[in-house]
Amino acid sequence: MFSPTSRLRSATADTFALVVYCFIIGMAIEIMLSGMSFEQSLSSRLLSIPVNIAIAWPYGLYRDRVLNMAKRHGGDHFLVRSVADLFAYVSFQSPVYAAILWVIGASSAQILTAVTSNLVISMVMGVTYGYFLEYCRRLFRVALP
């Protein structure tokens, strides 16, 4: 239907990956670490779906640029790629996540705990999301950068 280099195909893959990944991981963090109720977390996750739809493709483009810059300056090493993936994820997602929690009425302490936990968990999560995104792009047959 769309060519592997199609922007729509790429945007669809990026959107699918971000919505699925953030829903599952975000709910786990909010309930298990931040002390949010199931209802608060579900509200946050449901609000995050349209937000993630809006930011998924811009994040994918941002991530690709960060990875390309890291590759250009640090080579194509696993560690360089992992640190770049982590930086891209944390620098783009943390402000968005804090805003979502604020909108659903989480307390300042809950927001601080959730965002801080997310930063710590992002040591693995941001890199893991990068691999999940690449997997989804392959599923959608997107030409990888």
Curated annotation (Swiss-Prot):
Its main location: membrane. The keyword Metal-binding does not apply. The chain crosses the membrane at residues 16-36, 42-62, 86-106, 111-131. It is a multi-pass membrane protein. Keywords: Amino-acid transport, Cell inner membrane, Cell membrane, Membrane, Transmembrane, Transmembrane helix, Transport. Exports L-alanine. The gene is alaE. GO terms for molecular function: L-amino acid efflux transmembrane transporter activity. It comes from Pectobacterium parmentieri (strain WPP163). GO terms for cellular component: plasma membrane. HAMAP family: L_Ala_exporter. It is found in: Cell inner membrane. Belongs to the AlaE exporter family. This is L-alanine exporter AlaE. GO terms for biological process: amino acid export across plasma membrane.
